[in-house]
């Protein structure tokens, strides 16, 4: 009679290097969009703050732009969440993909300026624990 060991992983989805690699064009596009939206939101918030400081009505175009940018950002972030892909540093474009390497749950680690997925790290070691993929 055999003994079966059932491993409970933290994440439901685990990416192979190839699966993560295939998503990079879309991930790059989303990272660029998120950074643009973050900058736009900052500008809109500064404008709205100035308007409220002056006692002006904050309705109108600026509020509409802010709401649209926020909704677009939330939509993109929902795509990351749905796929269980994690943005670790938006400004750097640092992204982690859950994976299994040698029966261990780890993250494949990628930055937006890297041409391909080449590194991994333990779940709790972060970027400083990056190692080349085997």
Predicted features along the sequence, with ranges:
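Long, hydrophobic N-terminal alpha-helical segment
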Residues: 1-49
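Residue-level detector of functional hotspots within protein domains
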Residues: 6, 59, 71, 92-94
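A generic "functional-site adjacency" signal
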Residues: 13-14, 74, 102
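Amphipathic alpha-helical coiled-coil segments and their boundaries
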Residues: 13-16, 23, 30, 55, ...
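Short acidic/polar alpha-helix capping motifs at helix-coil junctions
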Residues: 39-44, 57-60, 70-72
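Heptad-repeat coiled-coil alpha-helices
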Residues: 43, 47-50, 54-57, 82, ...
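Charged, well-structured alpha/beta interaction segments
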Residues: 61-85
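Glycine-rich, aromatic-bearing surface loops/beta-hairpins
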Residues: 78, 82-134
